[in-house]
Curated annotation (Swiss-Prot):
Native organism taxonomy: Eukaryota, Fungi, Dikarya, Ascomycota, Pezizomycotina
Family affiliation: Belongs to the PIGF family.
One biological process term in Gene Ontology: GPI anchor biosynthetic process
Region (Disordered): 1-45
Keyword terms, alphabetized: Endoplasmic reticulum, GPI-anchor biosynthesis, Membrane, Transmembrane, Transmembrane helix
Species the sequence originates in: Pyricularia oryzae (strain 70-15 / ATCC MYA-4617 / FGSC 8958)
Role this protein plays: Acts in the GPI biosynthetic pathway between GlcNAc-PI synthesis and GPI transfer to protein.
Gene that this sequence comes from: GPI11
Topology with respect to the bilayer: Multi-pass membrane protein
Name of the protein: Glycosylphosphatidylinositol anchor biosynthesis protein 11
UniProt keyword Phosphoprotein present: no
Subcellular location field: Endoplasmic reticulum membrane
InterPro entries per record: GPI_biosynthesis_protein_Pig-F (IPR009580)
Transmembrane domains' residue ranges: 49-69, 83-103, 132-152, 160-180, 202-222, 233-253
Superkingdom to which the source organism belongs: Eukaryota
Length: 264
């Protein structure tokens, strides 16, 4: 029997080991894995895209109103109830849900003190519920706005549907975004009523629409005998024009304040 040197004898190598030595090391991805429940940001949610989309909303609403202005002069009630209000409601809901922060989304939760039991913290606000609640509050706020218009000289008995629909337009444009972003927080509404709230597009739109409604009532008593002088064509026109101007003015002030904060 031949002798075999144990030193020179080669051990059989498996194919897996041979392939493992020949293959280069795999480079691992340094980026952390996505968290559970996270989603890819859509193009609309991009900060640059969302700014331009939000900036185009008042201009779009004003263009739609201009296209429907002739019909508004001919039949104010039918045009407001069947065309203007449904279209504006859809635009406002899209604007709020996609581009505005819902009330409570940026709330900072307080850490429990030593010995204090940790309270159950709710998750993110329910956007669908917040939208429905904001629409309901918008509808509830319409009768008080109607009453204010009557106090400022709107017809009391003869044009009640006209006044109510005009008040609903004003409430939908100005109060719905505020209800959606501020919710029922008393401090936020006190700051808004006391003119101490920071100026943004929603506050600017509110101020501009109210001033536009007041300015739009000026041509009504003039003796020009024009169809567009009928209630509430000029007032509603002033609301939409003032809302667009105020919204862009508030947006500009907000950007200037943010730019100044970055520089400081």
């Amino acid at each position: 029997m031949p002798l075999v040197d144990p030193v020179t004898m080669s051990t059989p190598s498996t194919p897996a080991k041979a392939m493992g030595k020949s293959l280069p090391n795999t480079v691992k991805d340094p980026s952390p894995p996505p968290k559970a429940g996270s989603h890819t940001r859509s193009p609309v949610e991009s900060p640059s895209n969302s700014y331009y989309i939000a900036a185009s909303i008042p201009a779009l609403q004003l263009q739609i109103f201009v296209l429907l202005w002739k019909r508004l002069v001919d039949d104010p009630v039918a045009t407001m109830s069947r065309l203007i209000l449904p279209v504006m409601a859809l635009i406002q809901v899209f604007y709020a849900v996609v581009l505005l922060p819902v009330a409570g989304s940026g709330k900072q939760w307080r850490k429990p003190r030593p010995g204090e039991k940790k309270k159950a913290q709710g998750g993110e606000p329910n956007i669908a519920l917040a939208t429905l609640l904001s629409l309901l509050l918008t509808l509830i706020a319409t009768p008080p706005i109607h009453a204010l218009m009557v106090l400022f000289g709107a017809p009391f008995l003869t044009h009640a549907p006209h006044t109510f629909l005009c008040a609903l337009n004003l409430s939908l444009l100005t109060l719905f975004p505020l209800f959606y972003t501020r919710g029922a927080e008393a401090s936020a509404w006190r700051a808004l009523a006391g003119f101490t709230a920071p100026i943004d597009e929603s506050v600017g739109g509110l101020v501009g629409a109210c001033f536009g409604a007041w300015l739009g009532a000026v041509p009504i008593p003039l003796d020009w005998d024009r169809d567009w002088q009928r209630w509430p064509v000029t007032v509603l026109t002033g609301i939409y024009v003032g809302y667009a101007i105020g919204s862009y003015g508030g947006r500009t002030l907000l950007r200037i304040r943010g730019y100044s904060a970055k520089r400081s």
